[in-house]
Regions:
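Loop-helix junctions at membrane interfaces
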Residues: 1-267
């Protein structure tokens, strides 16, 4: 039943996108779209599981970043095609048997369409308001992460129980505080340095990365895992909150840099 609902949602998004924003034949858009698909698939294949403070369950992958840049660069129709192609080819190359779970296909669609719609509808006044909201959200996420770490003494990861000792908690607090500080310094530095057009691009990069991290990483993906494997929704939030505190600043820097380079090339 969930597959049918997800299929209807994906098809509805596609109908809306192609009806509201009819595609125009554009060789440059096609070429960029193909490059984004290739880059996303390569990064997906390079994803690795690494130990994080002794916990071997943190998946490091940057595959979402080319999709976000695609959303900020391409027309909505091309964004939809890029997301579907990336998900399909990724499954083919991974040699995954059976029918794919469409929840992750919906993730890919949102990872391109959310940035694209932000690009279309966001104006300067809304940018400044949303930037403040983003900062507040980041502080809240960081505080929740610290509070959660402070309250737990052990965590079940990959079927094994790990003790969260005081030195580990302190290290996590320092990492969260450091990444949040770096993010705010980075935002302030570029706000004072960039011209108006580049500042708009920078705001879009910030809002896109944070929006995707909150909707896909923090909400949808845990829900899909609960639906597929019965993993409790909050079981993985410990690692996801910590991962978001690190990956959001990194993602903003990479997305903005990639987007700025592409804009210079296509101008």
């Amino acid at each position: 039943m969930i597959q049918i609902i997800l299929g209807v949602i994906i098809v509805s998004i596609g109908i809306f996108v192609f009806y509201k924003y009819p595609m125009k034949s554009d060789v440059r858009q096609m070429t960029l779209g193909a490059l984004f698909v290739i880059l996303a698939i390569i990064l997906k294949r390079l994803a690795v599981m690494v130990p994080f403070l002794g916990f071997p369950s943190l998946k490091i992958t940057l595959e979402v970043l080319p999709l976000i840049v695609a959303g900020l660069t391409l027309q909505p129709g091309y964004c939809f095609i890029v997301s579907i192609a990336t998900d399909f080819l990724g499954l083919v190359l991974a040699n995954a048997g059976g029918f794919p779970f469409l929840g992750f296909t919906l993730n890919a669609v949102l990872q391109t369409e959310i940035p694209c719609l932000l690009k279309i509808y966001l104006n300067e006044k809304n940018e400044r308001l949303l930037e403040r909201i983003v900062k507040i959200v980041m502080v809240i996420i960081s505080l929740l992460g610290c509070l959660y770490v402070f309250k737990i003494n052990e965590v079940n990861i990959s079927g094994s129980m790990y003790q969260v000792t005081l030195p580990i908690k302190f290290t996590i607090f320092v990492i969260i505080a450091a990444m949040l500080t770096i993010l705010f310094i980075f935002i302030r530095y570029y706000k004072n340095k960039l011209k108006e057009k580049d500042l708009h691009l920078f705001h879009l990069s910030i809002l896109s990365v944070v929006a995707i991290e909150l909707t896909v990483t923090m909400f949808l993906t845990p829900y899909w895992l609960q639906t597929m494997y019965g993993i409790p929704f909050f079981a993985s939030q410990f690692v996801r909150i910590l991962k978001s505190c690190v990956m959001i600043p990194v993602g903003i820097i990479i997305v903005y840099t990639m987007n700025r380079m592409i804009q210079k090339v296509i101008r």
